[in-house]
Amino acid sequence: MSQKITLIKDKVLSDNYFILRNITYDLTRKNGDVIRHKREVYDRGNGATILLYNREKQTVVLIRQFRVATWVNGNESGQLIETCAGLLDNDEPEACIRKEAIEETGYEVGEVRKLFELYMSPGGVTELIHFFIAEYSDSQRANAGGGVEDEDIEVLELPLTQALAMIKTGEIRDGKTVLLLNYLHSSSLIY
């Protein structure tokens, strides 16, 4: 017998920017026992992220920006080094990531490769992230990047070896970025 879920209550607690829900549900276990759970679920929509790499220069493009949640959780500056990313809104994942790459990094990418889709914090956040990689060259630089009006993004071009070392030193602490850097390192794309 598989588990059965019965929704008891779905109450919206906040919809200021994203949606915070209080969900009450009954979970029928495989043995037939029913357990009632009450959980808060944060629905911020789905997203996409991309790691840009240059095979010839052995480099990657990352960004640094303020992330309030890291600041609240003890990151003194709130600055986080990460891959380019954005919420899908009404876009398809590939269209979203192409738009975000131009806005955040300044690079207009050519061929992109989708790797996988992952839930990053499924205990309380609904977001499913689509992961991409793409090769870039200096000739694809369309602008300086830096994000849109309400963003303050620094574009970083780093040797892959340095970016990997920054994971070990704790300078890179973003999950999606660590996954993509390690994927690139373990593939034959850049070495």
Curated annotation (Swiss-Prot):
Gene Ontology MF: a single term:
metal ion binding
User: Which reaction(s) are listed as its catalytic activity?
Assistant: GDP-alpha-D-mannose + H2O = alpha-D-mannose 1-phosphate + GMP + 2 H(+)
Cofactors, names only:
Mg(2+)
Q: Which UniProt keywords apply?
A: Hydrolase, Magnesium, Metal-binding
Intrachain disulfide bonds: none
Q: What GO CC terms are in its UniProt record?
A: cytosol
Q: Which residue range or ranges hold the Nudix hydrolase domain?
A: 43-180
The protein's matches in Gene3D superfamilies, at most eight in alphabetical order, are given as:
Nucleoside Triphosphate Pyrophosphohydrolase (3.90.79.10)
Q: Where is the signal peptide?
A: none
Superkingdom of the organism of origin = Bacteria
For the keyword Protease, the answer is no
For this protein, what is the EC number? 3.6.1.-
Free-text comment about domains: In the dimer, the N-terminal domains are swapped between the two monomers, such that residues of both chains contribute to the active site.
Under PANTHER family, the record lists:
NUDIX HYDROLASE DOMAIN-CONTAINING PROTEIN, UDP/ADP-SUGAR PYROPHOSPHATASE
Describe the protein's quaternary organization and the partners it interacts with.
Homodimer.
Q: Under what name is this protein listed?
A: GDP-mannose pyrophosphatase
- Lineage, opening ranks: Bacteria, Pseudomonadati, Pseudomonadota, Gammaproteobacteria, Enterobacterales
Protein's gene:
nudK
